[in-house]
Amino acid sequence: MYDPARDCYQAEGESADARDAAEIAGGEFLADSATPETKSDSTKSDGNDPKQETSETKRPAYNYLPKIARKETTSGSRDAASAKPQLKRREREDVRVAGDRVAPRADMGSYVDYSEKESRERQDRDRDSRDHRDRDRDRDRGRDRYDSRDRDRYDSRDRPRDYDSRDRDRDRDRDRYDDRVRDYDSRERDRYDDRARDYDRGSRDSRDYRDRHDRERERYDSGNSRETRDVRESRERSLSPTREPKPHDPAAPAPSKQKRPSQRGGREAAAARAAQYRAEMEKREARAQAAAQQGDQVGDSLVRNHYNQAPERGVVARQSSPIIKLRNFNNFIKSVLIQKQSLGFGMRVIDMGCGKGGDLNKWSRQRVRDYIGVDIADVSVQQASERYHNMQPRPRFYAEFHVADAFGTPLIDIINPRAFPVDCISSQFAMHYAFATEELARSMLTNVSNSLCRDGVFLGTIPNSDKILEGIAGGLKESEPKEGEERYGYFGNSVYKVEFNTPPTKDQAFRPPFGHKYTFYLQDAINNVPEYVVPFEVFRALASDYNLELIYKKPFLEMFDEEVKNDLNMARLAERMKVFKEDGSLGIDGDQREACGFYLAFAFRKLGA
């Protein structure tokens, strides 16, 4: 029956005092082990209760169940120290069995459990509604834990966002990287300037700097003092075509075996005539050299003025040029030459005849370390510097530009000596100006040889002398007369034209090999600028005198066909640079193809130290 004072059910005849004594003793209290007082009390019957049991059929009053029901304890004001023993005591608490319902003590919290005989409907009806709330709360708590793990696993910048946010983050990261690169460049530049100031005012290390500078000047003055013994001996054994045989001296006497005193007067007269002849020849050479220098100065001024007056065109104007296919083709050839013949990452490069800086992006893709541009046209150098500072993305290499003649002036007088030696020297569509005289050509090769390190590379593009000979042999067209100028004839087409003011050579070689002048015209690019023929075999033999070995030589058209056919990456590069024919295939056709065939590419390697 239910006891309101204890808030639980108790069996008939149960003694409360005996049960409390059992709780205090901690033992099991069963009907079999009850005291006489308890048995006598248990045999008492209540007349009002219809359910009375005899002593033979009495069920045990208490029994431990193997499974304790789910509970909700309310500790109230009890502290943590007293709550733990109380919990253990509740685990040992016996449960009153009344019928088929299990009910806990009042001080044990609210237990809810049912026997196997209870129906599912009654379980659902009597189950506490708070159980559902607990299950929902646990499910939400688990979902929160999963979300927190997901937040910890992925950074906030890696989550899908709108394109504007990603662009802003990318720009921010790029700006941070550019700031680091700019800070590094500024530190390097400041350190470079500090060393230069120490060198100028004479610091502790100035003596070593000046001695090194003097040694460099001696190397330039001596022509090529770093050549090896084997190279020098091979050069002395080989006959260079640039060295012409000396003319016959008519005043020189015939060799005679007579040694009589009567022959002394004749020998003295012959020696006097020979000295007079040599003096006349020296005067003639001096006049010719002065005329050549005057012509070179006029030619240099024309070249300088032409490139200074050429306007700087934007990307849109260049794309609308009538020779855009030729420009794309030439840029592709230069890109392939730089990519395949240069040394690779971390180079220090000198560009002789840098112009407006059209090759800055090509060298940037090679990840060079330093770029030094030298050109005779001051306006072009200024435009090249502006192009470098406006490059997007910002360049990762240091660049400096100088206005000077890279062929006739020693580079050590133009560039700081600490920049030498360099890994690569490039001269794109400019080296033919150095073949105006032999002295200028040798000065150019001296700069190249003395500036390169061991195994350094000298590469460039020049007009093909074989194509010039073919054009002359095919017959020259008559030039239109013009007042104040002498014109002999020309060959070419609507895109380019090579015109001679004097009758060109008729044989298959240019003798003498220097000073063969012609006027070159290229549509929308070059307007009748004087240039000079570069006989390539003469150039190769002359370069061997300066420890430069030829490693590559290809005309433009052959080079394009070979690279596109054998290298898939080069074919993809040609597609990106839009080198297409009219039918959409790779290449160039029409008059622009003939103009591209006018040039060739070369590369030399520096031998020795």
Curated annotation (Swiss-Prot):
Residue ranges, compositional bias (Basic and acidic residues): 38-59, 88-104, 114-249
GO cellular component terms listed in the entry, alphabetical order: nucleus
PROSITE patterns per UniProt: RNA_CAP0_MT (PS51562)
Gene Ontology terms describing biological process: 7-methylguanosine mRNA capping
Residues that bind S-adenosyl-L-methionine: 334, 353, 375, 405, 428, 433
Site feature location: mRNA cap binding: 356, 362, 387, 432, 531, 599
InterPro entries from the UniProt entry: mRNA_G-N7_MeTrfase_dom, RG7MT1, SAM-dependent_MTases_sf
Record-linked Gene3D superfamilies: Vaccinia Virus protein VP39
Stated role: Responsible for methylating the 5'-cap structure of mRNAs.
Family assignment from sequence similarity: Belongs to the class I-like SAM-binding methyltransferase superfamily. mRNA cap 0 methyltransferase family.
Protein name as annotated: mRNA cap guanine-N(7) methyltransferase
Species assigned in the record: Yarrowia lipolytica (strain CLIB 122 / E 150) (Yeast)
Gene name tied to this protein: ABD1
